[in-house]
Amino acid sequence: LKGRLETLKVHSKDVLMDETVDLDALALATAGLVGSDLANMINEAAINAVKKGRKYVNQADLFEAFELVAVGGKEKKDRVMSDKERKIVSYHEVGHAIVTALQTHSAPVQKITIVPRTMGALGYTLQTPEEEKFLQTKDELLAKITTYMAGRAAEVLVFSSATSGAANDIENATAIARAMVTQY
């Protein structure tokens, strides 16, 4: 956390930022990102501010840049889903969020969206940890698996079938389960 905060400070020293900017919160949310990702985030935030006609970067610019770097591309608002697909994606993402909220070992949900991204995601549920952790307990790992599978479960519960939208969730849940068996 301290290293990410220092990296963010180094890359933002020449960038004008307003009073809403909280680099501590950004450092906490960016666990797993490397220095070049953090530098890209600061640069993208500055570009966002300039595009919007502002001299100062604000927290919203930084969060938008975080999503671009960490989540997978820019919003692709011109990708038009059918009403049925939008409904499926909505239930899928809400499934993740509800299960996250009901578990005691999950990071809280910060954002849910069904706006497609340029990297392929039709929506996502963003969780941000409340504190930096270097180890995860079995209960925390099982909570992650449960959360990943909750989107698919919501699809089956509401629509009586699952879609290909859960493919990445299944990959992530499987990777955690495999690591639990073979590495921990």
Q: Model-flagged regions — what are they?
A:
Residues 1-13, 19-29, 40:
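Conserved AAA+ ATPase core "coupling" helix
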